[in-house]
Amino acid sequence: MGILPISQSSFLADYPLTGSGESYALCGTFFTVGCLNVAEHLDTNLDGVNMSGKAYLERHKTTCHRALCPICWPDWANREKDRATERLKAFVLKGRVLKPIHLTVSVPNADYGLSLQGMREKAYRSLKMVHCIGGMMIYHSRRKNLDDVWYYSPHFHIIGYGWIIDVRRNYELSGYVVKNIGVRKTVEGTIFYQLSHAGISEKHHTITWFGCLSYAKLHVKYKEKEESICPICQERLHRLIWIGEGECELPDFEGVAFFDNPDNWMIKPNHLIYE
């Protein structure tokens, strides 16, 4: 009895992998945000440049933040990773800060036909049996074989907390294999890597939380995203449009500040602050 090729697979939970979909037309293209409030830029310096009468500019990349987008999936993964890391760090047990562990839970062949929710519920029970008290779960629908070809092999990656025991007893009772495989150099790196080839469903969250870290038991006040502001006058940055002569020659680099004649730019009608 073999495993069906991916194209022929009819398993309910055989979801496509991160980055395997199609991008939108603007994904990965760049746009400009900046500050034209040059009246407040008088007699100011930025990195050794006299900004008097100059517009402050930044280039940003357009992203759809979709997990299946082959261009923008890293932006989605980074956002998910940052939020998950905040939640993991917020957990303390009786005043003690614990070190996260990294587990896998592999689904037995007999349950391959279950829905994702059905497999998750059984995986949760196995984690409870081996004394994993809570954490985050990422679903992987496939593994690679020796020929570097993806095949259906549902399993879960867990980053959480606990003292893992009774693994053999759990396997004998449930058929689900729990392994403690250790974190990478950082928890953040582990989360990002696992998200990079997760099984993506449009109906289900890629990351779910359980046990002591579930939404019902752990309430976290997440950091609010900082507003994009001009480092010179502290005004909000606006989406800008080039109106100068010829083509805009600003290079497509993020994280770099530029300056220019403000006459070459205008605020985009119905402007949107870059988010």
Regions from the language model: what does each represent?
Residues 1-152, 161-275:
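Right-hand nucleic-acid polymerase module
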